[in-house]
Amino acid sequence: MLSDDQITELCTLALRVEDHYETPQDIEWGLEGGKFYLLQARPITTLYPLPESWRGRKDHRIYISLGHIQVMTSPVSPMGRSVLSLFFPFGRPRKPGVYNPLLAEAGERLYIDITPVLTRKFLRKKYTGGMKGVDFLMGKGVEEALEEPGVLEGILSTEKKPKIASAFPYIKGILPSVVKGILTSKPLPRREKIVSGLETYLSSVEENTGGLKGAEERLIYLRDELENFVFKVLPLLGVLFPALIIRSKIRGKIQEWVDSDLDEEIQAVERGLEGNITTQMDLETGDLTDRLKDLPMLAAFFKESGMDIGALEKGRLLKGSETFYREFDRFMEHYGFRGLSEIDIKNERWKDDPKALLQIITTHAESEEKGAHRAHFYQLTKKAEEAVETIILSVRNSAGGRKGVSRSRKMRKMLNLFRCYMPLREHGKYYLMKLFSIIREELLDDAEQLCKTSVFRGTDDVWFLEYNEMVALAGKLDSGYVFQPEEIKDLQKRIDSGRSRFERFCDVEPPRVLMGNGTIPRPSYSSEGIPEGALIGMGVSAGVVEGRARVITDPGEESLLKGEILIAPFTDPAWTPLFINAAAVVIEVGGTMTHGSVIAREYGIPAVVSIPGVTESVKTGRHIRVNGSRGFVELLD
C-alpha cells in the first residue's frame, strides 16, 4: 500500500515523463528501498491530446476539427497552423500579427472553439444544421455534446454572447454584392467582373512583394494581405451565398408548384456547371492526357524515370515532346501552385514536385479514350440545359395561365443564377492557395538565407517555426545580426521538438468534435432500412454502382484505373483529376457541400462520404456496391 506522499511522488514522476515526451505516457515503475524507478514509458495512443491552454479550465467548451471542414485530416505543421490562424477571420482581433484565439492546436491539428456561437439560440440551430452539410457526424457530434448534462447550461452561464456588431464589417462588404448579384439580369458579366478583380488583386500582391527590399518588410506585407484576404473575396461570397440558398429554394418551389417527380432533372441541373475552376483544371488535365497519348515514348519515359522534377525536365529533350510541354507549361502557370493537402503551407505544390500530377496523367493515358473527358462533360452540360427547360415547362403547365407564366419566369431566373454563380464555389480557395504560394516562396527564400548563416540546417526547418518567429528572424537577417551559438542551439532545439511532435501524430486519427473536459462525442448513423453489414455514410451524389474498389491514400504513389471505385481518406482539388476515371467515390470525411461531393455531382458519379475508417474496412480489389442515393456501401464478396 502506497502512502499519500508516495502517491504524490509517483504522480510527479508521471508528469515529468509526460512533459519530457510532450504527450501522455503509460509508465511502468518499481519501488525499491523507498525509491521509485522508471522501468518503461510508451505513449497512451487511446487518448487524444488536449492543448495546454485547455487544461484546468472549469468552463464548458466545444471544439470542431478544422481539418474535417477542409477535408484534410493529416497533421498541419507549426508554420501551417500559424498561417491559418492569421488568415481565419472570425473571432480574431483586428490587430496586425495576432493569432486567432478561437483556433487551438490538438494533436498537431487545428480545432475551432465554437462555444461563443452556441450562446445564441438562433445561431446554435443554424450552425449545427449547417455543420451537418459540411460533415454530418460533426454536426451530430456537436448536438450530442450539447445534450450532455450541464453543458449548455454551463455555456450560457459562463460564456459572453458574441456582439452582433462584430459581423458588421463582413455584412457591409458582402451586402452590395448580394444585392447586385440577385437583381442583375446579366449574371455572367457580373461573375466575370468578380473573377477578374481577384486575378488583378493577386497579381498586384506578387508584384508588390517583389518590389520590397527587406525580408522582414515582405513577410509583414504578406501577413497583412493574409489577414485581410477575406475582405478581398467578399464580393465572391456575395454571389455564392445566394447560389447556395437558391439551391434549396429551387427544390422547395418545385415540390410546391409541380405535381410530378423531377428529382432526376434537379440532379442534372447541378451537373456540368461551366466555370468551376477545379472542373476546368480537371478537364485540362484530361487534355494533357490526350497529348501524352500521341507520345508513347514520353509516357514510357515518365513511368521509368520515377516522374520527379528532374525527369520532367529531361523529358523536354525527347523528340516531338514540344506539343505536350507547351500545354503542360500553360497548365502549370494556372495550377502549379496547387498540391496535395495544400491547406498546410509546408506541403509541396505541383511546381515543386509534379509526381502526383504525372502519375494521374500517365495512368489516364493508358485507360482513357481520347477526348472522353470533354465528351462526358459536354453531355452533362447538354443534359443540364435540357433539365432546365423541362423544369420550367413543368412549372408553367402545372399552374397554367398568367400564374404559370409568372412562376416559370421566377424559376428560370433562379436556375440561371444558380448555374452561373455556383461554379464560383471553388474560386475562394483557388485564390487563397495562390496567396499561400507567394508566401511559401518568400518563406523558403528566407530559410535559404538562414541556412547560409548556419541558423537553419535545411530549408524545411522553416515549417517547424511559427510565422511571427520568421518575421523576427527576417528582421535580424536584414540588419546583419550575428546569431550566437547558444541562440542557434535553442532555436534548433525548438525546431527539432516541433518536427518530432509533428511526425509522432501522423498516424493518429483526429476526432471531429472535442469537448473541453476531454470527452469525444462519437455519434453514429441510423441503420433503419440499411442492408445488414453495409457501411453507412452520407449520400451526396445520387446513383448506384457496382465495381472494384481501389483504396488510395497518396495519389502520387497510387493510380485509379477506368471504372474503379475510389476509396479515399479525404480529397482536395489535387485529388479530383482521379474522378475522371472513377465509377463512384467513397470518402471518410465530408458533407453535401464539401469539395469531393460537389465535384462528384458535377461529374454525375455516385458518392458516399463521412464513413469513418472506410479505407481500412474496404480493401483494394473488393467487389462493392455504392448507393449514393441512400448513403451506404455494400461489401459483395
Positions of PLM-derived features:
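Charged, low-complexity surface patches
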Residues: 6, 439, 589
